[in-house]
Regions:
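Bacterial Sec-dependent N-terminal signal peptides
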Residues: 1-24
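Glycoside hydrolase catalytic-domain context in secreted enzymes
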Residues: 18-726, 733-745, 749-751, 755
């Protein structure tokens, strides 16, 4: 078996300079502007505070509503202390006009010559402009991944940028590029699924959509890759807790999506709040400086997450003092600290200055950090004196944007089961719809929607239709609705109670078919920690009672993460996974249910069957063995990439041709053999039959989503070269090895040899 080390592979060596001549000019300008600053001014550029630090508060220190800038605080922090960045929304979503007034007030200090640099403002607009009243809300990233359609990711990024910049905010803390391989994690719904290729392609398109070709345009924002890197695999499943990731797997699984985003031009990165292999992300010099900045050529800024520099001392216990924490983080390559409170920010400024005076942080490192910050500000056009007024964005909340969000929801919805073609529904049928999740937008959107946790129903988008409201328009009096259960949070944990079970069953007796929407309370970060993936007993009990009626029961899963439904799946006639589809998920679900649109979503993760077993599609051969006669060794509820349709597709004529020079051309014919037009995700997998490191069962190497009319067929071609056969070896080098391989596509497979 012959090894080939790929000396030029992107994850291991210095990459070419992808930045244009114009970027080089901007970089030199940033260096010049940095050189004109005093040490105090430079340090202040690295400090980021939350909006609340600038707002008026009452006698108890609570922000006064409606919010208003405290001019004295603004003068102190922005004009006198020259703080470089502000973030966040205060309490809840704001109108464009309010946002614009806030940003203009903050920007006026620079406009009037009272600061040396404009303030860089950032928010978490992770599934649309979710902190702007009337913003277009898309599916959460896990649903976006289920579309397997990079074009939709680009469109979501473009619209989110337009509507976020309409508020005046130029920096978006998105996309999340962490892999979704720990479903217990509270932020699983923010990921692009379990596969690095899928996450890379979808994530790169989000970046391109956010930034366009010129981030300084008034319709673009700076993207922020997060959370670099390994944050999403906590051993405990709880947020901000340790991960153990071998370097080989870090290279092969967790870094590629970030590398793809760097190649797409991402301007900023947010660092992992947790620790990996005992090293907190914020002091990992190898990852931040050696790899990201030096080897990958990343020229943008690296920002901490919320209070994470302080936590090096208070939580991680790797720094003996706050000063040590600052020294360790900045020297590791951090450029900006999300401090973020008024008061602690002064301690940060003072301790940072002491560290520079004591030569614990070099002026070279400080200059580099500030140059990166100013570079991003220049790239965004923030040195222009005037912000674009909020009312000069005619497409904000437009039908065009709403239709794009609905298209994303439509292509995300995944049909997992459809016995006896119980779907689509007929309008003549009497339908019982059950479930609180069907009748409240908070269960369609999840966290990061109008508020941090997304629980406050008072800010639900006016005019957006729940699944219940949308289905009612189609079925009129033929639709009955019962809430069925009540979800709430008690002491921080999700609680559920069955409501009016007798009434639910009474209406079930009058129905031809029953739809029950299952849901979870919206939550993220530490408030979203869970102890189990099991669906709550109350919802399961209600489903079982409805199944006992003998009527066809259809499950709709409105979950940000998979929940265990093993006990209720067998007697369910149909199951649809809607993820968290956004404000237009209700309309999208209705169009799927009545057959106006054919479902085309595919699972972006392996759907688990058992609470204690986490499986991935790229398992190794030893995991496929068992001595249990009545058990399958690999037994998910549904596999990665699975999704059904109202039509059928056939795969045929899989062929592979050796092109020489270590390249092969693969081709396959895909035909719509059913009665309806549809979209199919053609997935190409390669198996390395024997390797020096235990090979995966298969690896996704290419995918393409195509549209086919009934009877139509298309020939698809995939060119395979050495990079499609690579893996990371025992010395953490990307290599490929000559030998036998198997290409799989649909139900077809073909063997080939790389010589």
């Amino acid at each position: 078996m012959r090894n080939f080390i790929l000396i030029s592979f992107i994850l291991l060596i210095n990459v070419p300079d992808f930045y244009s001549q114009q970027d080089a000019i901007i970089w030199k300008k940033a260096q010049k502007l940095t050189s004109c600053l005093t040490t105090d001014q430079k340090i202040a550029q690295t400090c980021q505070v939350t909006l609340d630090a600038l707002l008026k508060v009452d006698a108890n220190g609570q922000v006064i509503k409606p919010i208003e800038i405290d001019q004295k605080k603004c003068e102190k922090l922005i004009e006198q202390q020259q703080i470089g960045s502000v973030l966040n929304v205060s309490t809840h979503t704001l109108t464009r006009e309010v946002w614009n007034n806030l940003l203009n007030t903050i920007h006026s200090a620079y406009k009037n010559g009272k600061t040396v640099a404009p303030v860089l403002y950032g928010v978490d607009a992770i599934h649309g402009a979710n902190y702007v009243v009337g913003g277009t809300l898309f599916p959460q990233e896990i649903g976006l991944a289920a579309t397997w359609n990079p074009t939709l990711a680009n469109k979501m990024g473009e619209i989110t940028a337009y509507e976020t910049r309409a508020s005046g905010v130029p920096w978006n803390f998105s996309p999340v590029l962490d892999l979704g391989r720990q479903p217990l994690w509270s932020r699983f719904f923010e990921t692009l699924g379990e596969d690095p290729l899928l996450a890379s392609e979808m994530g790169a398109e989000l970046v391109k959509g956010y930034q366009g070709t010129n981030p300084a345009e008034s319709t673009r924002v700076a993207a922020c890759m997060k959370h670099f890197v390994g944050y999403s695999l906590p051993r405990s499943g709880r947020d901000r807790t340790p991960a153990w990731i071998p370097e080989r797997l870090m290279q092969e699984l967790y870094l590629p999506s970030f590398k793809a985003a760097v190649d797409a031009g991402a301007l900023t990165v947010m660092i992992n709040s947790g620790d990996v292999n005992g090293t907190p992300g914020h002091i990992n010099k190898y990852l931040i400086t050696d790899l990201l900045k030096n080897k990958w050529g990343f020229k943008g800024l690296a920002v901490s997450d919320w209070e994470d520099v302080r936590m090096l001392h208070t939580v991680h216990k790797v720094a003996a003092s706050q000063k040590d924490a600052i020294v360790m983080a900045i020297n590791a390559g951090l450029d900006m600290s999300m401090v973020p409170y008024n008061g602690p920010h002064e301690e940060y400024l003072n301790l940072f200055k002491e560290a520079v005076s004591e030569k614990k942080i070099s002026m070279k490192r400080l200059n580099d950090a500030v140059t990166r910050i100013i570079y991003v500000k220049l790239k965004l056009g923030l040195y222009e004196k005037q912000l674009t007024p909020w009312n000069e964005y005619p497409k904000f909340g437009s039908e065009e944007f709403k239709n794009a969000a609905k298209d994303a929801a439509l292509e995300s919805i995944t049909l997992l089961k459809n016995e006896n073609e119980v779907l689509p529904l007929k309008k003549s049928e009497k339908i019982l719809l059950v479930g609180e999740a069907a009748d409240n937008l908070i269960f369609h959107n999840g966290a990061w929607t109008h508020t941090w946790q997304g629980e406050d129903t008072s800010f639900n988008t006016k005019g957006a239709m729940t699944f219940r409201a949308s289905l009612q328009k189609e079925f009129g009096q033929n639709l009955m609705f019962e809430k069925g259960y009540d979800l709430s949070s008690v002491n921080g944990w999700e609680a559920c109670q069955i409501e009016n079970k007798e009434k639910v069953l009474q209406n079930a007796s009058q129905a031809d078919k029953i739809i029950i929407c299952l849901g979870e309370m919206p939550a993220t970060e530490k408030p979203g920690d869970v102890k189990s993936l099991n669906l709550c007993e109350e919802q399961q009990e209600l489903v079982k009672a409805l199944q006992e009626t003998g009527k066809p029961v259809i499950l709709v899963l409105l979950f940000g993460k998979p929940h265990i439904i093993r006990e209720i799946e067998p007697k369910s006639a149909a199951i649809i996974n809607a993820y968290l589809p956004g404000d237009f998920g209700g309309d999208a679900l209705t169009e799927i249910f009545v057959g106006k649109v054919n479902p085309s979503g595919k699972l972006p993760y392996t759907f688990p069957k058992y609470d204690g077993v986490i499986e991935y599609y790229d398992y190794v051969n030893s995991e496929s063995k068992t001595n249990k006669l009545d058990a399958k060794p690999i037994d998910p509820q549904w596999p990665f990439g699975f999704g059904m349709s109202y039509t059928s597709y056939s795969y045929s004529n899989l062929k592979i041709e050796n092109l020489g020079a270590e390249k092969f051309k693969a081709s396959i014919d895909v035909k719509n053999t059913g009665p309806k037009a549809g979209k199919e995700v053609v997935q190409w997998y390669i198996t390395d039959e024997y390797a020096s490191i235990t090979p995966a069962n298969k690896k996704l190497r290419h995918f393409e989503k195509i549209s086919l009319e009934p009877g139509q067929s298309k020939k698809l071609v995939f060119t395979i070269d050495s990079k499609d056969l690579q893996f990371v070896n025992s010395t953490n080098e990307w290599i490929y090895e000559q030998g036998a391989f198997t290409l799989k596509c649909g139900d077809q497979s073909v063997s080939f040899e790389m010589k």
